[in-house]
């Protein structure tokens, strides 16, 4: 089961690398939908079946509508693929190579990454001793997001705040 989750998480990141180097809206939307589905699979394999189902229905359902309209508006007769442009293909391959090196480096025994120390998280237990569950994994994951994952939550909020200004700047009409 752990290998399946690992493969899904690697494909999850590969999908987002494909989205970030998208040459056409068709392939970018496809990459985002595949990555969203894999993320829901990771959540469901971790024990959060209800959360995975809700994210799958709401997030991917909304994305299908948005990307359906986007693709209909930006239909190209000959859409550009990842291999048709050398720069886009090289950006995709460099991102993929960086991910492979990161995974190899993390599994090599070196546990420190850019100031974040991953050791000591062995004591972070979501289940009780002997298989007796104190709290469901859905609830303990939400609690750990606000306690141990505070910096991740703050960074995600900051990125959403900055994305408002980016979207406003892109869509602003210049006369």
Swiss-Prot record:
Q: Which reaction does it catalyse?
A: a ubiquinone + NADH + 5 H(+)(in) = a ubiquinol + NAD(+) + 4 H(+)(out)
What the entry lists under InterPro entries is as follows: ComplexI_Subunit6, NADH_UbQ/plastoQ_OxRdtase_su6, Nuo/plastoQ_OxRdtase_6_NuoJ
Q: Name one GO molecular function term.
A: NADH dehydrogenase (ubiquinone) activity
Q: What class of enzyme is it?
A: translocase
Compartments, record wording = Mitochondrion inner membrane
Q: Name one GO cellular component term.
A: mitochondrial inner membrane
Record's superkingdom? Eukaryota
Coiled-coil ranges per the record?
none
Topology versus the membrane: Multi-pass membrane protein
User: What are the BP-aspect GO terms?
Assistant: mitochondrial electron transport, NADH to ubiquinone; mitochondrial respiratory chain complex I assembly
Q: Please provide the record's keywords in A-Z order.
A: Electron transport, Membrane, Mitochondrion, Mitochondrion inner membrane, NAD, Respiratory chain, Translocase, Transmembrane, Transmembrane helix, Transport, Ubiquinone
EC annotation from Swiss-Prot or TrEMBL: 7.1.1.2
Which Pfam families does its entry note? Answer: Oxidored_q3
Chain ranges passing through the membrane:
1-21, 24-44, 51-71, 87-107, 112-132, 148-168
Q: How does it assemble?
A: Core subunit of respiratory chain NADH dehydrogenase (Complex I) which is composed of 45 different subunits.
Instruction: Please state which protein family the record places this protein in.
Output: Belongs to the complex I subunit 6 family.
Protein purpose: Core subunit of the mitochondrial membrane respiratory chain NADH dehydrogenase (Complex I) which catalyzes electron transfer from NADH through the respiratory chain, using ubiquinone as an electron acceptor. Essential for the catalytic activity and assembly of complex I.
Q: Spell out the protein name for this chain.
A: NADH-ubiquinone oxidoreductase chain 6
């Amino acid at each position: 089961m752990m290998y399946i989750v690992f493969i899904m998480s690697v494909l999850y990141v590969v999908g987002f690398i494909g989205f970030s180097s998208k040459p056409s809206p068709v392939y970018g939307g496809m990459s985002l939908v595949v990555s969203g589905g894999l993320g829901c699979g990771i959540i469901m394999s971790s024990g959060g079946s209800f959360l995975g189902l809700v994210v799958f229905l709401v997030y991917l359902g909304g994305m299908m509508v948005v990307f359906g309209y986007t693709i209909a508006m930006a239909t190209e007769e000959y859409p550009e693929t990842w291999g048709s442009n050398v720069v886009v293909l090289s950006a995709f391959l460099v991102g993929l190579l960086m991910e492979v090196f990161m995974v190899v480096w993390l599994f090599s025994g070196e546990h420190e990454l850019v100031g974040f120390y991953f050791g000591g998280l062995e004591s972070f237990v979501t289940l009780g001793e002997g298989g007796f569950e104190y709290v469901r994994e859905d609830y303990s994951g939400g609690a750990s997001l606000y306690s141990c994952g505070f910096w991740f939550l703050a960074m995600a909020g900051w990125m959403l705040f900055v994305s408002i200004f980016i979207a406003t700047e892109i869509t602003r009409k210049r006369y």
